[in-house]
């Protein structure tokens, strides 16, 4: 397995679009997010793996255990790996036991338009405004470091991602983001300032973000840690269906010999 241009047109078809965190994967392949790729052949690949700048990794469809082992070892040769892997995978090949597993839930994708989202937007409290994300606003946001880390810079996020804040005058009440966009789907996330939690602002903020996504023809995907009950409740309010459990399988970098 050797490096290949992550934007190679031959790569997207190798990957299952139903993989967990697929908007991140296809965002990397489409050049919206930083990342790297390796493949068995740089000209006509049949096996490939992709890794985000923050370490989340994806392996293409495989039919044999040997192919999966080869791809995972290829990733681990150069970095610590967090492999996104569905708990309900039915393939004959399975990854080797990880050093640790982070249990996650994936929801969707679902359309970014609908009556439920319209009603949530109508619930915007009096005196609260919606402000699109810009550099000055993002500099004040709680999740600035997360989106900057995912994109490599604030400017890159503002170019390739989408965000907004719910504001009361100059106070940030909630931040909603679509940091990962790929394959026609945006993964969305939200954080409410601690003083304003429990007021339904998280789902309202995402509903307003969804209007922007719908204008761009994008669907919505949601993911969170299994034990994040508040996030699961927000997903339900937004209209996401049953969760699909998956794991981020954490592997140490292989020792150099």
Predicted regions and their residues:
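Acyl-donor-binding surface of acyltransferase catalytic domains
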Residues: 32-140
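Conserved active-site alpha-helix within GNAT-family acetyltransferase domains
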Residues: 90-100, 203, 226-244
